[in-house]
Amino acid sequence: MLLFGESRPGAGGQEEVRAQLKERVIMSPLAAKRLAILLERGIRDYESKYGALESEAVRTNKESSEPAAMQEPPGHAIEELQEKAEALFQLIKTLGLEVGYERSFKISDKSLLANRFLLGFSKKSIQRKAREKIIDICVRMGMPDPFLEDFSEKLSEANYVHFGFEEDEGTSVYKAYLEFYDKIEKEIRSRPGKSESFLLHLGYKWDPSNHRKRALTKYTWHPSLSFEQIRKRTAHILDPRKYGPPFEIAGGILDLASQKIPHQDVLYLEVTEGNNPRRSFDINMYRANLQLKELYRLLSKLCEHYSIPLDEFRNLYDRVETKTFGHVSGGISRKGADFLTIYYGVEGYRITTD
């Protein structure tokens, strides 16, 4: 059922907001599910460029509503980034597109890795020769041949593409993701009334200095789970009997989000890779519009558990505390170690070569 109405200020100038309902539309379950997918896609399209709907709008020039050209990622002097990270930015600049720029930091035992980012865009935003330009970036990134063949084959089914970089302990990783919202919508139309999971992303990840170190990652979306169902599924991945602190901290973040948004606004994914122990979850809560500073207590406990010096954490936290929290990923790494990763601050930028 859809309800339409107007919001009005509460009586006496208080912060209370009242809703006056005017109309309602009753839909079949299939129509409602299709509408939910379309709304989800539209909102994610917007948020991939501008951030959460209720957060501050993308930075603009005073004279224009267009996003300012980004010559380097804010908060990171380009000379401080490693050569491979800078090379990826230069490749994306050749597209001349507005992209979503998202950062993250990964915490595990005695390790805090913060040199991580994703650059994402809609395939349709490339007006000419989109396929050729995207494949060219993959080639110039040095994507391994087996990945390049598979990526090229599946690119036609994707509607979003993301490229990323992360600094790992003693090495670095390039990443390329395909996102399949359009394909999911078609699957739902072809199989009405069925509740199931969907492959939302494929992630191609490799060490640019050693192509033997590579992994194909599958991100499976489980729609419309309740908060309790999400907690139960995360417990199967990050067993609280063995990994109590990170499990409880991820749950604490979910609790904070649950106070601001319904469970339908949470995007829950499970992550797997073939031939290694990697298994994790990803809980996207951008719509809760939480700032990282609201997670400080939980993040401090996480650093204490993983033996991260407080000054090392504060050096990162003090620069990003007002950024919008996005999603938390947690589970078991390829090496069999537990971890949590915090994603934050997706913003829209126009990256140009000018």
PLM features: residue spans?
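Structured alpha/beta or helical-core interaction and ligand-binding surfaces enriched in interleaved
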Residues: 66-354
